């Protein structure tokens, strides 16, 4: 599926190729962040993000969010909306294998 929404105007601006005034160092992480956003946009299920070890895909403790790493300091955080919630609820498919979309995407300082 695709990225459906952003939680941060600056992350959305980066995705759309617009200038941003965000405090994160766009000149240092911008190109790599955009590559990772493309990876997220191309993912059809959460397990797709596990295929590349460099993503360092993880579930964020205490939230319904996930992240992939841009580098040691920065990560892209997002929620996952399965296309068929009823299949998840019935147990016929695991969330990690369920087709879906990324929601509320934003770049966060890990430290």
Task: Give a label for each model feature.
Residues 18, 22, 58-60, 110:
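Basic, Lys/Arg-rich DNA-contacting stretches centered on the C-terminal catalytic core
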Residues 4, 30-33, 49-53, 71:
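Generic structural signal for well-ordered secondary structure
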Residues 44-67:
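A short, surface-exposed loop/turn module that caps and links secondary-structure elements
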Residues 7, 33-36, 56, 70, ...:
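Amphipathic alpha-helical interface surfaces
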């Amino acid at each position: 599926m695709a990225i459906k929404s952003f939680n941060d105007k600056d992350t959305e601006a980066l995705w759309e190729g617009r200038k941003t005034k965000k405090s994160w160092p766009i000149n240092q992480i911008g190109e790599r962040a955009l590559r990772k956003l493309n990876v997220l946009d191309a993912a059809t299920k959460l397990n797709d993000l596990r295929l590349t070890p460099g993503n360092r895909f993880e579930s964020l403790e205490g939230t319904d969010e996930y992240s992939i790493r841009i580098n040691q300091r920065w990560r892209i955080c997002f929620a996952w909306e399965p296309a068929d919630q009823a299949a998840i609820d019935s147990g016929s498919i695991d969330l990690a294998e369920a087709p879906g979309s990324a929601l509320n995407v934003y770049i966060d300082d890990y430290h």
